[in-house]
From Swiss-Prot:
One of its GO terms (biological process) is ribosome disassembly. One of its GO terms (molecular function) is GTPase activity. It comes from Arthrospira platensis. It is found in: Cytoplasm. Its main location: cytoplasm. Catalyzes the GTP-dependent ribosomal translocation step during translation elongation. During this step, the ribosome changes from the pre-translocational (PRE) to the post-translocational (POST) state as the newly formed A-site-bound peptidyl-tRNA and P-site-bound deacylated tRNA move to the P and E sites, respectively. Catalyzes the coordinated movement of the two tRNA molecules, the mRNA and conformational changes in the ribosome. This is Elongation factor G. The gene is fusA. Belongs to the TRAFAC class translation factor GTPase superfamily. Classic translation factor GTPase family. EF-G/EF-2 subfamily.
Length: 697
């Protein structure tokens, strides 16, 4: 089956932002104007097309990255609407991994918020080109240029307005396109009657002149040939054409040198068609982004170009239980994925058969025969393929770069309300953990309780809610527990020697390691410096495995050991008695012996907390954060709205129930956001209490 839309006319984009910036409403309007839906859905009414989980419709927040296909100006646009709540960071992370461009939505009143910064960092990590859409221009306090300044200063982006709004706040009724130098005025509520003219309204003429000049400067700086022409224009030479500006702006955006900034009000149906034009004009096709990299079977780096005739390579970026069956969402990078075909999962070294392929219009599933290079869709029939796995041709195997998956920071014990539900609970937990890699399930070895871990209170709340709704399991939930960790502060040399003689064949394994503190965030790092065969090659891996397993339980309070580096420097073996198991045990002993002498300390997760409150309450809030062992890092006041903002680093252990506390301390007018920052040493007095508790004292 031939390709119906050329690859150059495909756009894979995400819509990402802070919670309440208006992402889902923006997606709804895009679907309305591009003809996918014929009636607008509203988030606050619970009718949005992309919010199709029951909890999303109730809470008015988008939890899972819904993938939808639409068309505009003969281009196919595949859209992923991502959640703005920090507890669902993995959804943003996995969508960034498979996108070619992003619309970053900002509220024209709230501006750059903490989650805007998180999303921006994720887009930076994957080098995804961006357009900034400053939304809610009709709101009281809306300020396009203030938010544009925040994008430049706080996100350090080379943001360049390519539009200027016409009218302020409730009078916002149009915009001037600085590339085409045309005015667009909206004359009806649906935003479908638009007056287009070459005349610039008098009240914005000075602003238009100022920002048109900034736009020309910015595009000229990304293109030497254009810079010459621009300098000649300043001296009375030929002016830059609209095509030249558009072309350079496109190239600058794709290379990440420029972020075009546009404005609108999705709720009031203003500016959405121009946003779609900008997606087509400035965001890249799959052929315009760097080829995807991966590892070939021989360990060398390989690349796959976006081409239907190249060998198949695709990444599974999400797994979801669905009434249809188990959906595995994939992004095809090269080649063609066909319904009914056998695929090779290079990550798992397994073959599987795809029974059906579908593309989504949110609730609606449309069956297709194939997915081609650059396509996003979902496969049914894959039982072993999980998030981050590579699907490819067995004859042309490659393992693509996977996703960055953050560690969970909070855990709770969970048990079914009735014994009969035990089996249903374990099925539910398995299904949910397959869908969400930041959701972990384990069994506490001492209490034998089932423990679930995630990214925050809301994350776990929603997962427990889903257990009840989708799997009909009622569960009792314990109090939240903090994911403490242990590490070392001193470098030492230590050894592990395992010898067992009990008649017949004995056991012998001996390793000498240098144990030292690792880089923050490095986890466990192993290096072998064995020369001369004091430890045979076949025993090095088992020794490393033993060390890794020993790190799963530290010596102070049994929490996992992180940020340590172990270098294998020496050892000895026995021709007959040595075995892989003996060296695995010796490796484990070396870590346990060494850690006790290497000044072990307890670490706790620190959260970046941002609180916004009316000025009158700021003293109370700062005092409260200090009492929670918080470190205040910054404070600013928006005089125009009498709102104060505080940024602090606070231990997660002291933040449980903060949502209720902040409401009572600010008469319900305070809002806050919280995300994981880093691990930090627990003060000794606090550590003693935690250690005593872990030992049951």
């Amino acid at each position: 089956m031939a390709r119906t839309i050329p690859l150059e006319r495909v756009r894979n984009i995400g819509i990402a932002a802070h919670i309440d910036a208006g992402k889902t409403t923006t997606t709804e309007r895009i679907l309305f104007y591009s003809g996918v839906v014929h009636k607008m859905g509203e988030v606050h009414e619970g009718t949005a097309v992309t919010d199709w989980m029951a909890q999303e419709r109730e809470r008015g927040i988008t939890i899972t990255a819904a993938a939808i296909s639409t068309s505009w100006l003969d281009h196919r646009i595949n859209i992923i609407d991502t959640p703005g709540h920090v507890d669902f960071t993995i959804e943003v992370e996995r969508s960034m991994r498979v996108l070619d461009g992003v619309i970053a939505v900002f509220c024209s009143v709230g501006g750059v918020q903490p989650q805007s910064e998180t999303v921006w960092r994720q887009a930076e990590r994957y080098q995804v080109p961006r357009i900034a859409f400053i939304n809610k221009m009709d709101r009281t306090g809306a300020d396009f240029f203030k938010v544009y300044g925040q994008i430049r200063d706080r996100l350090r982006a080379n943001a360049v307005p390519i539009q200027v709004p016409v009218g302020r706040e409730s009078d916002f009724h149009g915009l001037v396109d600085l590339v085409a130098m045309k005015t667009y005025l909206y004359t009806n509520d649906l935003g479908t009657d638009i007056q287009v003219s070459d005349e610039i309204p008098e009240e914005v003429q000075d602003l238009v002149a100022e920002y048109r000049e900034k736009l020309l400067e910015a595009v000229a700086e990304t293109d030497e040939a254009l810079m010459e022409k621009y300098l000649e224009q300043l001296e009375g030479g030929e002016a830059l054409t609209e095509e030249e500006i558009r072309h350079s702006l496109r190239q600058g955006t794709i290379k990440g040198l420029i972020v075009p900034v546009i404005c609108g009000s999705s709720f009031k149906n203003r500016g959405v068609q121009r946003l779609l034009d900008a997606v087509v004009d400035y965001l890249p096709a799959p052929t315009e982004v760097p080829p995807i990299k991966g590892v070939l079977p021989d360990g060398e780096e390989g690349v796959r170009y976006a081409d239907d005739d190249a060998p198949l390579s695709a990444l599974a970026f999400k797994v979801m239980a669905d009434p249809y069956g188990r959906l595995t969402f994939v992004r095809v990078y090269s080649g063609v994925l066909q319904k009914g075909s056998y695929i090779y999962n290079a990550t798992k070294n397994k073959k599987e058969r795809i029974s059906r392929l579908i593309v989504l219009k949110s609730d609606e599933r449309i069956e297709v025969e194939e997915l081609r290079a650059g396509d996003l869709g979902a496969a049914l029939g894959l039982k072993d393929t999980l998030t981050g796995d590579t699907i490819c041709d067995e004859a042309n195997s490659i393992i693509l770069e996977s996703l960055y998956i953050p560690e969970p920071v909070i855990s709770v014990a969970v048990e079914p309300k009735t014994k009969q539900d035990m089996e249903k609970l374990s099925k539910a937990l398995q299904s949910l953990s397959e869908e969400d890699p930041t959701f972990r399930v384990s069994i506490d070895s001492e209490t034998n309780q089932t423990v679930i871990a995630g990214m925050g209170e809301l994350h776990l709340e929603i997962l427990v809610d889903r257990m009840l709704r989708e799997f009909k399991v009622e569960a009792n939930i314990g109090a939240p527990q903090v994911a403490y960790r242990e590490t070392i502060r001193k470098s030492i040399r230590t050894e592990g020697k395992f010898i067992r003689q009990s008649g017949g064949k004995g056991q012998y394994g001996h390793v000498v390691i240098e144990l030292e503190p690792g880089e923050p965030g490095s986890g466990f790092e192993f290096v072998s410096k064995i020369v001369g065969g004091s430890v045979p090659k076949e025993y090095i891996n088992p020794a490393e495995q033993g060390m890794k397993e020993a790190c799963e339980s530290g010596v102070i309070a049994g929490y996992p050991l992180i940020d340590v580096k172990a270098t294998l420097v020496d050892g000895s073996y026995h021709e007959v008695d040595s075995s892989e198991m003996a060296f695995k045990i010796a490796g484990s002993m070396a870590i346990k012996n060494g850690v006790t002498k290497a000044s072990p300390v307890l670490l706790e997760p620190m959260m970046k907390v941002e609180v916004e409150v009316p000025e009158d309450f700021i003293g109370n809030v700062i005092g409260d954060l200090n009492s929670r062992r918080g470190q205040i890092e910054g404070q600013e006041t928006d005089q125009s709205q009498s709102i104060a903002k505080v940024v602090a680093k606070v231990p997660l252990a002291t933040m449980f129930g903060y949502a209720t506390d902040i409401r009572s301390k600010t008469q319900g007018r305070g809002v806050f956001s919280m995300e994981f920052s880093h691990y930090e040493e627990v003060p000794r007095s606090v550590a003693e209490t935690i250690i005593a508790k872990s030992k049951g004292n």
